[in-house]
From Swiss-Prot:
Keyword Isomerase: no
Family: Belongs to the methyltransferase superfamily. METTL16/RlmF family.
GO molecular function (one): 23S rRNA (adenine(1618)-N(6))-methyltransferase activity
Documented EC number(s): 2.1.1.181
GO cellular component, one term: cytoplasm
Domain of life: Bacteria
GO biological process per UniProt: rRNA base methylation
Protein name: Ribosomal RNA large subunit methyltransferase F
Encoding gene (name): rlmF
Protein's cellular compartments: Cytoplasm
UniProt keyword terms in alphabetical order: Cytoplasm, Methyltransferase, rRNA processing, S-adenosyl-L-methionine, Transferase
One Pfam family cited in the UniProt record for this chain: Methyltransf_10
Chain segments annotated as transmembrane: none
Record field: catalytic activity: adenosine(1618) in 23S rRNA + S-adenosyl-L-methionine = N(6)-methyladenosine(1618) in 23S rRNA + S-adenosyl-L-homocysteine + H(+)
Length: 336
């Protein structure tokens, strides 16, 4: 065991009668997800000593971080990215989204399985596989995971110039990302693909974590509920997001349903330039509207991939305009 400050507290806490036994693995995560096991804070602290001041014993006698503290969550992410993905430098502005990495990794792995399902169950790997990350943010989570696990190259877009500046610093400070992640600013806040997707560009898949809420008030109310569940009974009228997030990352007009519906509409113009369009869908109630939009644009194939992280269930919807014959030609040309 590491000799860090909380160790004595840990030893005392471990003798508590209310010591709780947790399962060794988190239920529901993808088999290839590196985060299936419970966090090994000893190992993470070796990789990232900056994490140590944020470690403390829980009421159940375990060591953890305060997930209601944005700085603690940010430092945990920094440690995870360094320990599992070899990211030496990672920093984001204080008000940027700091996503839970296990769930983001699940999206990437299930997306890899989606591609494999069209390639004889073999995951296409390497720099020839190009993905478009809509809303890459300052954190660059999807490109970091996709490059490390499968060698894919990414184009990341965002409307926030400050987020992109932070993302560019992450890219410049990590050699593995320099030639595998290209960043573009979406200058039209009402557009998704238009303006950042050149006519001759082809992508094997797109991915997106769309803004969840329809207003700033709705986003704040959700944060208050989350903090209450984490045991923070006194919550401010404008609470600080424990996972951060600027307005453009958390809400937009029409919320998740409106954003993804616009994405579906725009995807028609790129129908022959992409194999699979995909987007996370957090609300199950959003699905009927998205299915309706996909029927309207006559998508050839639509799939819904369910994912689970413990008790939380999410999914992403994938659609393609390529016929089976066109899919086979795409695979032969780009994935062989």
């Amino acid at each position: 065991m590491l000799s860090y400050a909380p160790e004595n507290a840990y030893q005392r806490a471990s003798t508590m009668e209310n010591k709780k036994v947790f399962p060794k693995e988190k239920s529901g995560l993808h088999p290839r997800n590196r985060h299936r096991s419970r966090y090994d804070f000893d190992a993470l602290s070796v990789s990232c000593p900056e994490l140590i001041p944020f470690l403390a014993p829980t009421a159940y006698g375990d060591i953890s971080v305060d997930f209601a503290d944005p700085l603690a969550v940010k430092m945990l992410n920094k440690a995870l990215l360094k320990h599992f993905y070899g990211i030496e430098y990672w920093d984001i502005p204080a008000d940027s989204l700091c996503p839970p990495i296990p769930g983001r990794a699940d999206y990437v792995h299930h997306l890899a399985d989606l591609l494999a399902s069209c390639n004889g169950e073999v995951i296409p790997k390497g720099k020839n596989i190009a993905l478009l990350d809509i809303g890459v943010g300052a954190n660059c989570i999807y490109p970091i995971i996709g490059q490390r696990e499968y060698g894919w190259r990414f184009t990341g877009t965002d409307i926030d110039s400050h987020a992109l500046s932070a993302a560019k610093m992450v890219v410049s400070m990590n050699p593995t990302l320099k030639n595998t992640l290209r960043l573009k600013q979406q200058k039209d806040p009402h557009a998704i693909f238009e303006g950042v997707w050149a006519v001759n560009e082809r992508y094997d898949a797109t991915l997106c974590n769309p803004p969840f809420h329809g207003s700033a008030e709705e986003a704040a109310a959700t944060t208050r509920r989350k903090l209450h569940k984490l045991g923070k009974n006194e919550v401010a009228a404008k609470p600080v997001q424990n996972f951060g997030g600027k307005n453009s990352e958390l809400w937009c007009e029409g919320g998740e349903e409106g954003f993804v519906s616009r994405m579906v509409a725009e995807s028609v113009a790129k129908a022959q330039n992409c194999f699979w369009f995909t987007s996370l869908i957090s609300k199950k109630t959003t699905l009927p509207a998205i299915y309706h939009a996909l029927r309207y644009v006559k998508a050839v194939e639509v799939r819904t991939i369910e994912m689970a992280q413990g008790q939380k269930v999410s999914r992403f919807v994938a659609w393609t305009f390529l016929t089976p014959e066109q899919q086979a030609a795409w695979v032969a040309e780009r994935w062989a």
